[in-house]
Amino acid sequence: MSVLDEIIDGVRADLAERQAAVPLDKLKEQAAALPWPKDVVAALRAPGVQVIAEVKRSSPSKGALAAIADPAALARDYAAGGACMISVLTEQRRFAGSLADLAAVRAAVDTPLLRKDFVVSSYQLWEARVYGADAVLLIVAALSQDALVSLVERAESLGLTPLVEVHTEEEVERALDAGATVIGVNARDLKTLKVDRGTFARLAPLIPDDKIKIAESGVRGPHDLLAYASAGADAVLVGESLVIGRKPREAVADLVTAGAHPALRDRH
């Protein structure tokens, strides 16, 4: 069994517990009282290369990264540094995240939010709405094509922007067939956890220019952002290097400054 399969098994078990505790109708009732999600596509299409900063305590590849006792404070630092969107891990077992983290961040910032989890059910999309997300991660490798298409359509119907994650040529094709507008290329293979920063440069040419291309994993600083930019990235998602550093606001600001270089401003 791959690492991804193990994670999905845990996600399904935890999901079943939440579904038993909170009926779907209750989530729908709560969502109906909330404002419509923010326009994530517009934020990502702003001039230059945008920065998505992540609230991430742990990962399967590295284990514990940072305690992050106050995710709201970290999110405020990210927003002050200029992040165009904040990604919040909500998977419990391998990433030590929670929906409570998402709610805390939503209460702290006006920046668009991404719920980063292993979504396998439309119930999780309703959760994302209720807890304040504007976008949701959908991982192609974790879903059948029918499920992917269904979740993309349902997310959009709820006002959520699907960030559809790929790692191979076949997955790019599947993402496009599912109607994805925002496609994230993960340099990390979720089945082996190995990182290959060349993955983005290899797959980006397969993604049409009218789509938004996000480089995920492997961004250690401005030099990596610029490398991804040269390969066609519209945005980068950065987690580990921000949470293990001592100055997240400054680190985000450095990335944002690199992404705003005049040579990158007319890319959209």
From Swiss-Prot:
User: Which controlled-vocabulary keywords does the entry list?
Assistant: Amino-acid biosynthesis, Aromatic amino acid biosynthesis, Decarboxylase, Lyase, Tryptophan biosynthesis
Q: Which reaction does it catalyse?
A: 1-(2-carboxyphenylamino)-1-deoxy-D-ribulose 5-phosphate + H(+) = (1S,2R)-1-C-(indol-3-yl)glycerol 3-phosphate + CO2 + H2O
Task: Report the EC code(s) recorded for this entry.
Answer: 4.1.1.48
Q: Which residues form the signal peptide?
A: none
- GO MF: indole-3-glycerol-phosphate synthase activity; phosphoribosylanthranilate isomerase activity
Q: Describe the family membership recorded for this protein in Swiss-Prot or TrEMBL.
A: Belongs to the TrpC family.
PANTHER family from the entry? INDOLE-3-GLYCEROL-PHOSPHATE SYNTHASE, TRYPTOPHAN BIOSYNTHESIS PROTEIN
Q: Supply the name of the protein.
A: Indole-3-glycerol phosphate synthase
Q: Which organism is it from?
A: Thermobifida fusca (strain YX)
Its gene is trpC
